[in-house]
Amino acid sequence: MQLPDPRMIQLVMSLRGGGVTDAKVMGALERTPRHLFVPQRFGDQAYDDRALPIDCGQTISQPLIVALMTQALKLDDRCKVLEIGTGSGYQAAVLARLARRVYSVERYRTLSREAEARFEAMRLTNIVTRIGDGTQGWPEQAPFDRIILTASAPTRPDVILEQLKDGGIAVAPVDRENRQVLVRYARHGDDITETDLMDVRFVPLVKGEARAL
């Protein structure tokens, strides 16, 4: 019998203290070993509640932010999810534990391929990846029940929000003057309501597919 990783236990306690109350979200994070998504040189910090650098000048998000964003989506196992910014694949792997299927777009080829290898090793078969311009979403697969952005949009990401199904929820960091705010969007017919959740710090959402890397 494999004993629980004490680092994961400590992280779970930290997440609960930070406001993560959804047991399913907590379970998804517990079943997604973060050290598999962190560069080896940062392996000793994999279970610290902090963002860490990854390749291509990007980051793997702080576990608390991953958990709170996932919780804000109110996922169930029927949801079709769009993720903008695959990065290390950590957020997509957590989503895949809770949703029917995850479609994830990444502008960096290196990151997308590394994430795909991790998904395969973890036998996560309900994640579909694409290398491309995340600012355009994934219109060929729209509409989506849920949408999540893991990079901060300079303004409300209307092109992406157009791909949200009626009754759907999106969560995205958005630039506001000298700060970034995590915003939850909810579609009701042709109307989209906004709720500010918290201040955050993310890498910027960049237009286009990266020519190198």
Swiss-Prot record:
Please give a single GO biological process term from the UniProt record. Answer: protein modification process
The UniProt entry, under HAMAP family, shows: PIMT
The superkingdom listed in its UniProt entry is Bacteria
Q: Does the keyword S-adenosyl-L-methionine apply?
A: yes
Q: What is the annotated localization of this protein?
A: Cytoplasm
The protein's annotated catalytic reaction(s) are: [protein]-L-isoaspartate + S-adenosyl-L-methionine = [protein]-L-isoaspartate alpha-methyl ester + S-adenosyl-L-homocysteine
Task: Give the main EC class.
Answer: transferase
Q: What does this protein do?
A: Catalyzes the methyl esterification of L-isoaspartyl residues in peptides and proteins that result from spontaneous decomposition of normal L-aspartyl and L-asparaginyl residues. It plays a role in the repair and/or degradation of damaged proteins.
Provide the taxonomic classification.
Answer: Bacteria, Pseudomonadati, Pseudomonadota, Alphaproteobacteria, Maricaulales
Which Enzyme Commission number(s) are on file for it?
Answer: 2.1.1.77
What are its GO cellular component terms?
cytoplasm
Entry protein name: Protein-L-isoaspartate O-methyltransferase
UniProt keywords (A-Z) are: Cytoplasm, Methyltransferase, S-adenosyl-L-methionine, Transferase
